[in-house]
């Protein structure tokens, strides 16, 4: 996906939508990572990059995205250039809405929590969303939900099967919504009330804004370096 400003912007958009897809795949515990990614320190970008390489062999949409998309997915945690820093910064800004919390259960068993579950003091019941493709019947929380790797494996397999047939970014967006609406973006040491889909779309929106500022010259390489260096401070 090279040769024009619009195509490069679309590459950043797709990469940001998919930047955490490796978390979803890793939760299934059903896919191994190739040894060639061993030098990448953080786990889920390896899954993201490997999944994209596999799709590129089967699907012309992902094949046309080129190697640059794989590189953006693989290195957004340890950026080497400005585009990777844009995605890293967008990710950090999008993640700043999460509330910290205690986690006693295994991280892959914790469901997405409904945002209304903490409105009332003294509420001892715990509610969560089951893993299932988005539908009217599944869009309601249930009491005492605990997820399993087998459930994640079924969800991932169904997602990948449909993903292999997509032809454009619009289809990609709505397919991500269909399968990631019920997947928590983070469960370890944070309250799990933000879905992986909501985090992905918010991060993509921020990344596009940063990219436009960068393309217009209002955001420089020096600015990106300063902001990513100070993002945790």
Show where each model-derived region lies.
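Divalent metal-dependent catalytic cores for phosphoryl transfer on phosphate-bearing substrates
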Residues: 1-161, 179-192, 196-198, 226-232
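Short, solvent-exposed secondary-structure capping/transition elements
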Residues: 27, 215-220
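Short, solvent-exposed beta-alpha or beta-beta edge segments that form flexible loop/patches at the rim
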Residues: 206, 218-227
């Amino acid at each position: 996906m090279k040769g024009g400003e619009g195509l490069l912007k679309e590459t950043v958009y797709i990469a940001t939508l998919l930047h955490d897809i490796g978390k979803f795949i890793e939760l299934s515990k059903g896919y191994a990572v190739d040894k060639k990614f061993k030098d990448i320190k953080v786990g889920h970008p390896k899954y993201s990059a490997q999944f994209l390489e596999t799709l590129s062999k089967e699907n012309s949409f992902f094949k046309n995205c080129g190697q640059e998309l794989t590189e953006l997915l693989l290195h957004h945690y340890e950026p080497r250039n400005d585009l990777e820093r844009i995605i890293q910064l967008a990710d950090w800004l999008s993640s700043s809405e999460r509330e910290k919390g205690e986690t006693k259960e295994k991280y892959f068993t914790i469901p997405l929590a409904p945002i209304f579950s903490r409105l009332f003091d003294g509420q001892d019941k715990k509610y969560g969303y089951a893993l299932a493709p988005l539908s009217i019947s599944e869009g309601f929380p249930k009491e005492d939900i605990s997820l399993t790797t087998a459930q994640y494996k079924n969800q991932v397999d169904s997602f990948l099967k449909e993903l292999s047939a997509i032809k454009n970014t619009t289809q990609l967006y709505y397919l991500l919504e269909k399968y990631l609406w019920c997947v928590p973006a983070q469960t370890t040491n944070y309250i799990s009330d933000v879905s992986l889909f909501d985090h992905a779309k918010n991060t993509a929106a921020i990344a596009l804004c940063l990219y436009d500022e960068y393309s217009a010259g209002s955001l420089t390489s020096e600015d990106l370096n300063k902001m990513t260096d100070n993002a945790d401070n």
